């Protein structure tokens, strides 16, 4: 699949109003995240939005395409998970992996805002990763890597296991499933960010039990309200305290079918 935004602009002629509304939203970025996009970042994010709209006409990248929804549920949410952590302030260099990136979130916005970080986009769907690679090149993002694989497989590969400073995982599965996918990939002392909507005490207890088996702990839970719709979001931060036992991650499909920490 070839990405040519000049050609594909014809397909977007009916969406010029959306692009304008999206740009205005960026130019009036809400306070609260101790970050504001500069002019170069605004232009890059408009191109990102445009590229996702083009890709969405061919692939099921995302159901979220309305300008303010995209700003809030993709850009704001993607960046909030990192900006509300210590990594945005204390890690001038970082190796990051976005597990189950789908349409490129949170990895693409993170790569745009932190060009000094190396960001790997991981997804099991070839067509999505192929398109994201073309979009990344169009955006000039030299700090991206692209992986087509299942998280369980990558977590057992020496070139990826315990190699990342930060793992981001959003809309992939239950919290305990996400922990089993992500903790094997980060270094001891590294951080996993789980992006969640509602978050219950029962889920928190299950996650604590799972993390204990995986060599990690829940270090923080941050609740936030989205700036446009007022929806509730939770960002769960896991810290890896010791190496994950070689038993984890388990075989492909097992973390989801038999989640850790869940009492039957």
Curated annotation (Swiss-Prot):
Enzyme class, UniProt record, top EC level: transferase
Its EC number(s): 2.1.1.-
Family note: Belongs to the methyltransferase superfamily. RNA methyltransferase RsmG family.
UniProt entry tagged with the keyword Secreted: no
Gene, per the UniProt record: rsmG
Protein name: Ribosomal RNA small subunit methyltransferase G
Function: Specifically methylates the N7 position of a guanine in 16S rRNA.
A family per Pfam: GidB
Originating species: Synechocystis sp. (strain ATCC 27184 / PCC 6803 / Kazusa)
């Amino acid at each position: 699949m070839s990405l040519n935004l000049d050609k594909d602009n014809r397909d977007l002629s009916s969406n010029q109003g959306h692009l304008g509304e999206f740009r205005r939203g960026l130019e009036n970025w809400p306070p609260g995240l101790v970050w504001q996009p500069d002019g170069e970042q605004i232009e890059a994010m408009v191109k990102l939005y445009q590229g996702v709209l083009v890709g969405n006409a061919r692939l099921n990248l995302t159901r979220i395409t309305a300008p303010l929804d995209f700003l809030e549920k993709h850009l704001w949410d993607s960046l909030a998970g990192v900006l509300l952590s210590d990594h945005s302030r204390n890690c001038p260099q970082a190796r990051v992996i976005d597990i189950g990136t789908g349409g490129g979130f949170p990895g693409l916005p993170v790569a745009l805002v932190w060009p000094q970080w190396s960001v790997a986009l991981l997804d099991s769907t070839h067509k999505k990763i192929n398109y994201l690679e073309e979009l990344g090149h169009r955006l000039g993002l030299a700090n991206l890597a692209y992986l087509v694989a299942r998280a369980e497989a990558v977590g057992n590969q020496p070139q990826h296991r315990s190699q990342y400073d930060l793992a981001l995982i959003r809309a992939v599965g239950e919290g305990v499933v996400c922990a089993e996918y992500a903790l094997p990939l980060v270094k001891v002392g590294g951080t996993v960010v789980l992006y969640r909507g509602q978050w219950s005490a029962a889920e928190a207890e299950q996650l604590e039990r799972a993390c204990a088996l995986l060599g990690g702990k829940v270090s923080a839970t941050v609740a936030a309200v989205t700036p446009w719709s007022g929806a509730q979001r939770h960002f769960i931060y896991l810290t890896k305290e010791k190496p994950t036992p070689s038993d984890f991650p388990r075989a492909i499909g097992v973390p989801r079918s038999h989640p850790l920490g869940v009492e039957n």
